[in-house]
């Protein structure tokens, strides 16, 4: 793509390749949400409903990191492995995907998240847990989600979207999984560490609990959008070149 924001064309968005990409996003998001929500439910079952402790936080963060690593990897060669409306939004603002195709990515991701959350609730018989604030207000929660999502989408650009990435692209799914796991360790006890509107929306639909759901749309979209704009216009402009290793 040219790197400029583009609306796109319906014939491109409904091509065979695009339809396959939507299916890939649906499946990848379903896999990620099933694993992520399932880890939270498993912790609740194994601890008899005890509050999340440090060991549990690490376990949930690791499961989300591993789950996203796999979800991105299985979709990378088909759809790019976005698995997240905030990632798609950031890539659209950076001109890496058209707005129209991005909308269909969102639909696929949200449907995948809903199905994943409903399936894990059905299989376990346990109410689906949702993201929520703990010890912080709505404003602080939004800021936290902006920061952690900025880090996630910046990582996506640096390891997967930047045409200068070279061999770094081969470890993109690992890096993306690592940053999500690390961010959950930081933000989990406060905002929940969503970074992903679909990850929050799917469980909200499955449980019928939409409390503060707007935080998990506003924060990630602002953070993802900022990361896309910063990386696109600072590092992917025509006159930028990477520093040679001998110059460090």
UniProtKB/Swiss-Prot annotation:
Membrane topology: Multi-pass membrane protein
Xref: Gene3D superfamilies: Glycerol uptake facilitator protein (1.20.1080.10)
Tree of life domain: Eukaryota
Motif extent (NPA 2): 196-198
Induction or repression: Down-regulated by chilling.
Entry's localization field: Vacuole membrane
Signal peptide span: none
Transmembrane regions: 21-41, 55-75, 87-109, 133-153, 168-188, 210-230
PROSITE patterns linked to this entry: MIP
Keyword Repeat included in the entry's annotation: yes
CC annotations in GO: membrane; vacuolar membrane
Keywords, alphabetical: Membrane, Repeat, Transmembrane, Transmembrane helix, Transport, Vacuole
Pfam families, sorted: MIP
Expression (tissue specificity): Expressed in roots and leaves.
Function in brief: Aquaporins facilitate the transport of water and small neutral solutes across cell membranes. May be involved in transport from the vacuolar compartment to the cytoplasm.
Family as reported in the entry's similarity comment: Belongs to the MIP/aquaporin (TC 1.A.8) family. TIP (TC 1.A.8.10) subfamily.
Protein name: Probable aquaporin TIP2-2
Gene: TIP2-2
């Amino acid at each position: 793509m040219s790197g400029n924001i583009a609306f796109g064309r319906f014939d491109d968005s409904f091509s065979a390749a695009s339809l396959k990409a939507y299916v890939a996003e649906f499946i990848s998001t379903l896999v990620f949400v099933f694993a992520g929500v399932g880890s939270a439910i498993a912790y609740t079952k194994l601890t008899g409903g005890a509050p999340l402790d440090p060991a549990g936080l690490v376990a949930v963060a690791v499961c989300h990191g591993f789950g996203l690593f796999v979800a991105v990897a299985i979709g990378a060669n088909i759809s790019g492995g976005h698995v997240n409306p905030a990632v798609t939004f950031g890539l659209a603002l950076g001109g890496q995907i058209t707005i129209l195709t991005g909308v269909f990515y969102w639909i696929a991701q949200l449907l995948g998240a809903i199905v994943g959350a409903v399936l894990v609730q059905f299989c376990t018989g346990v109410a689906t847990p949702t993201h929520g604030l703990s010890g912080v207000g709505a404003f602080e929660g939004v800021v936290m989600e902006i920061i952690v999502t900025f880090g996630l989408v910046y990582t996506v650009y640096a390891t997967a979207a930047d045409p200068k990435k070279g061999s770094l692209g081969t470890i993109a799914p690992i890096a993306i999984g690592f940053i999500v796991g690390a961010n959950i360790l930081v933000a989990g006890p406060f905002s929940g560490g969503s970074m992903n509107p679909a990850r929050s929306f799917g469980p909200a639909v499955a449980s019928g609990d939409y409390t503060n759901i707007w935080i998990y749309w506003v924060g990630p979209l602002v953070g993802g959008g900022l990361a896309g704009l910063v990386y696109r216009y600072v590092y992917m402009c025509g006159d930028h070149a990477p520093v040679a290793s001998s110059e460090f």
